[in-house]
Amino acid sequence: MSQIILDEQLGASELVVPLQKWFKVRRLKDILPHQTILDDRIPQILLSLSSPTFLTIDRDFWDRRLCNPGYGILYFAIPDFRQEELAISLKKLLRLRRFRSKVARAGKVIRVSATKIEFWEFQKNRLHRMPWKRPGRQPSE
């Protein structure tokens, strides 16, 4: 079962329960309780886990330098108040052959917006783009 790690700003009530139907879901603060986890520590934490996929809405993670074969990063370009849309969008995204397995996501930093998916891959210099329609209302971006 794929392991999804939720960034700290993601609400547990909006995501953990719906996502647990399909994935093993953990929050960063549950992995390292009683610690403040700054963004620059997150890649090392992810490398200590078994091929996790890190889910975030923090734009700082849309950075090709974070590509590593030990994990994948999914950055959804949505505002904080739209977190309730993430579970359905994530499920739809992970049905795509290109992102279906943890092996397929490993080494990628993926940005999902209302109209497209973009991603960088480990040791590749090309930004990949593909069309996408996020479920639900479409924000103006």
Predicted regions: what they are:
Residues 46-69:
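Acidic, metal-binding active-site segment of PIN/NYN-like and related structure-specific nucleases
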Residues 1-2, 28-31, 47-52, 83-88:
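Short linear motifs at secondary-structure transitions and domain/linker junctions
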Residues 6-49:
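N-terminal first-folded block
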Residues 1-3, 7-8, 14-18, 22, ...:
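Acidic, PIN/NYN-like endoribonuclease modules and their adjacent C-terminal/linker elements
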Residues 38-42, 50, 57, 86-89:
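Amphipathic alpha-helical interface surfaces
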